[in-house]
Amino acid sequence: MQQPPPPPPPLLVPVHVLRQSVVLPTGEDANEWLAANLADFYNHCNLLYGSLTQFCTPETCPTMSAGPHFDYLWTDSTLFKKPIRLSAPEYIDALLTSIQMALDDESVFPTKPARPFPKNFQGTVVKQAFKRLFRVYAHMWHAHYGALAALGEEAHFWTSLRHFVLFGKEFGLLEKKDFAPMEGVCEW
C-alpha cells in the first residue's frame, strides 16, 4: 500500500488570493461564472493529468480508484447507461471527453448572450462535472503523487486542487462525501 504523501509544498498563489478569486463578482451572472470557471478547472485538471499519462496506464491502474476503498464505475447517458468498470485512463478519458462535449454544446454552455443556460445547469451539469473532476485529482494524489513530485509538479497540483475545492465549496458543487478519498487533506 502506498504511503500518504508528505504535506503539500507552498502554493503558487497565496490562499487569500485563491479565496477571493472564487467569489462571484458583483453584477456577474452566476451561470456565466460557473461556466467560465468549470472550463478553467477542466483545463487545469486535464493538463496535470496529461503529464501523468505515461504512468497511468491500463496495466498500472486497471480500475479507476482513489486509494484502497474508492473504486469508481463509469456511466453516461449515451454509451454506458449501466455502470461499468473501466481502467483509470479509460475512465478519465471518458470523463474529460464528456465534459469537453458539454463545453462545446451550445444548448448546455451557450456563448450567445440571448441564449439561456439549461434549468439544471448548476444542480446537475456543473455539479456532476465537479464531482467527477475531483475523482481525477483524488486518483492523481493516491496513485501518482510520486510521479507528480518527480516531475516537479507538486505546487501546481496543490494550487490547482485548493482553488478547485474552494470554488466547489463556495458554490455547493462538492459534498462532504465527495472528499472522502482525500479525507483530512481538503479541509480548507
Cite the ranges covered by each PLM segment:
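Conserved, folded interaction/cargo-binding domains in eukaryotic regulatory proteins
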Residues: 118-164
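Eukaryote-biased recognition of C-terminal alpha-helical segments
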Residues: 154-188
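A sequence-level detector of short, solvent-exposed, charge-rich linear segments
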Residues: 57, 64, 114, 148, ...
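Extended alpha-helical interaction segments
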Residues: 1-117, 168-171, 176-179
